[in-house]
Amino acid sequence: MANSKRDLFLKRRLRVRNKLKKMADGRPRLSVHRSGKNISVQLIDDVQGRTLAAASSLEKDLGIVGKNNVEASAKVGAAIAERAKKAGIEECYFDRGGFLFHGKVKALADAAREGGLKF
């Protein structure tokens, strides 16, 4: 029987998380969540279990409320890179969860890299 989209999503999420656990060396994790209309990202310190920085397309100061396109994702990526610099973070792991590295997720990652984050 064919797997549903949800089953495939969960398999990808577990596979990505297990790869990140193998590489764990104290660097924070850049966790991405994408919905139908919005995208959000957090820098998470898994050792202490706390969020170090976050950005979302729902934030009014980014000026992208109501837009759910690739350009909005790029603005969120630039915002998280700027906030990571303020927090003193230069390197992290990119945790795409179960989302494919394409479109909005890729635009966010590219903008974060251009902003100075290394992953």
From Swiss-Prot:
GO terms for molecular function: 5S rRNA binding; structural constituent of ribosome. Disulfide bonds: none annotated. It comes from the Bacteria. GO terms for biological process: translation. SUPFAM superfamilies: Translational machinery components. One of its GO terms (cellular component) is cytosolic large ribosomal subunit. Keywords: Ribonucleoprotein, Ribosomal protein, RNA-binding, rRNA-binding. It holds the Pfam family Ribosomal_L18p. CDD domains: Ribosomal_L18_L5e. InterPro entries: Ribosomal_uL18_bac-type (IPR004389), Ribosomal_uL18_bac/euk (IPR005484). This is one of the proteins that bind and probably mediate the attachment of the 5S RNA into the large ribosomal subunit, where it forms part of the central protuberance. Part of the 50S ribosomal subunit; part of the 5S rRNA/L5/L18/L25 subcomplex. Contacts the 5S and 23S rRNAs. Belongs to the universal ribosomal protein uL18 family. This is Large ribosomal subunit protein uL18.
